[in-house]
Amino acid sequence: MKRRLPAVAIFLGAFLLFGVQPMLGRTLLPSFGGTAAVWTVCLAAFQTLLLAGYFYAHMISRKPVRAQRILHAALLALAVVWTGAFAVLRPLIRGRFGESGQPALEVLFCVLLFAGLPYVLLSANSTLIQAWLAKSSDSRGVYRLYAVSNLGSFCGLLAYPLLVEPYVTLTAQWWGFAAGLVVYAVLLWRTGEEAAGRRLGGTSVCSSGQADACPSPGTVGSADQVGSAGVPADKNAWLWFVLSAASCFLLNAVTTYLSNDITPFPLLWIILLGIYLCSYIGAFSAFGERSAGWWGVLTLVGVVALAFAMRLEKAVQTLSIYLPLGVAVLLFGGMFLHGWLYRVRPAPAALTRYYLLIAAGGAVGGVAASVVAPLIFSQIWEFPVALLLLALLAALYFARPDPATQGVKREAVWLLAGVAVLLVVGDMRHQAGQVILAMRNFYGTSRLVNTTARTAFGDVLTARALRHGSVTHGIQYR
């Protein structure tokens, strides 16, 4: 099958999938305020819906392609009607949310209600098409279509703040999303027709009686038949889950930390999510696969640098140091984790299970960082926890035999990982020792801390300060 049509269908589906995320966030902000928690809880909801979409794709992929097309088209028609109904009713229900005592749960409910069905169906997009290709004679390079999917996601994410939100009303945006679903449904139907025709035609070597030409899930074939290490898929299944969970936990933790210490403005959230997607695009390629080890080294260097910076308290230092270092750690960590994830990919026959476990890890990591962490931590401890997790995973990566680690001295990497762990733990102890009282809710974290302050006469006195992130709201000399 020619790759142009599947690639266009995957690109458009991913474009719509990530275009609706900031659009839904924009819809909810007037009701819940501009706090970063609105966005991070939305991310957790999106990651959970992504899991539902991958599970749906995994289950229906066992059916014939024609049956899959009919079922998916029927559900897409329902999603179009659902989205159109919401576009009409949105002004009427706009003021009915945001007044409960559980805003996080209410945001989750709104995401499920407003965009749950179309999001689940769009989430299944790339997995379904790749599964169709894997069953045809044109199964080479199916995993690289995942990079096309992430490119579409990145374009959809950037298009919203630059081209859509400033010029199009919110109601028109939702109608445009419904129209996009219709176009996507047509493309998906045609892709399914070609996949079914190719499989049932006489061009497939698997249907010509040449059994040896048909790769089995455990066979080492082309670069996309198994991971580069040639390890059976079952032995790597836990890694698919853990690496995805770690990367999503990192994304949400960095977003919360930078939004709390700088300012919770939506463009920063989109930039961070865009960087996360770029790491997927770069990692799911031959370059990302070969360079995973070096990205692990850069990740450790970034963690060490950020651990030093976490001791700084001045707001100007926060903006000029925390922001670039936080972005760098997110990029380096994403390239490392996703490159490792690509290296341990299974044969195409097992790709729906692979993506299902990736989505499950993402959902668990997202919910842990944005929903569970605020409930159990009085401060933003999820950020140093994410840094510790990166350091430990980097040490584990270099403890495993892998061609990508050749040329790197493992002992030096383990030493660097140990330094990173000691610095992060030391920073956590230092911050905990300063805090007298900390309170955290959906809208942020406030701390009463011991500090020093210089008087107008130049004297340095001990004091207590009330802070929200790096912003000091008041000082009392002791």
Question: Predicted segment positions?
Answer:
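Alpha-helical transmembrane segments of multi-pass membrane proteins
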Residues: 1-207, 217-478
